[in-house]
């Protein structure tokens, strides 16, 4: 039987400015952030959380992403796509049962449509917004990454479906955390022999956001962003969870990376 494990992986980095990540900070200084994604192995079928950057940006960033490359430049090797990394760990892409999308921004959609038997779980509000985003958010959504024929989608409905238990056994729970994006969700991972891990994803890019010292450089709603962090802080304390922020280069360095894992 397959052990329940959490693998932390990275699909390259994004080069940007500090103020793109921490609002009104950095005085224009350069900043480079990791682009994490996650694999949960499970006897009921594996789950990929997000998937990082689409592999296409390894060879043609501007052709795939367009003008947003002027703000966020992807650094990705050809072997750093999520499918190749999961194969390198010895897992068959056909055994991935779920692709869970925290949201649909361009640095989180690398797994969509890459796993032939996967159901893609996303908030309905995020999916709908991604097709018709507001002008200030449009560059963050690459339609060809998620508007693909033949995909199996499962839509969650905000607070109505909050704390959705993906496997039905407590291993993976979604937490509705709008703000950074209208339909953002974070994840709680419970493992047999480790403390729970709270994957904030982009509800908190960095520990500065988590500790309420800065707002993220991009958000759809300031009020929702702040309240989602407060919600997660309460949840993390309740479950004594280890917090994994979305793009913090310093904090990310402290976690085990694949092929090491949490179990």
Curated annotation (Swiss-Prot):
It holds the Pfam family Lactamase_B. Keywords: Hydrolase, Metal-binding, Plasmid, Zinc. The keyword Zinc applies. Its EC number is 3.1.1.81. Disulfide bonds: none annotated. Its cofactor is Zn(2+). InterPro entries: AHLLactAttM, MBL_superfamily_lactonases, Metallo-B-lactamas, RibonucZ/Hydroxyglut_hydro. Zn(2+) 1 binds at residues 103, 105, 180, 202. The keyword Zinc applies. GO terms for molecular function: acyl-L-homoserine-lactone lactonohydrolase activity; metal ion binding. Belongs to the metallo-beta-lactamase superfamily. NCBIfam families: AHLLactAttM (NF045700). This is N-acyl homoserine lactonase AttM. It comes from Rhizobium radiobacter.
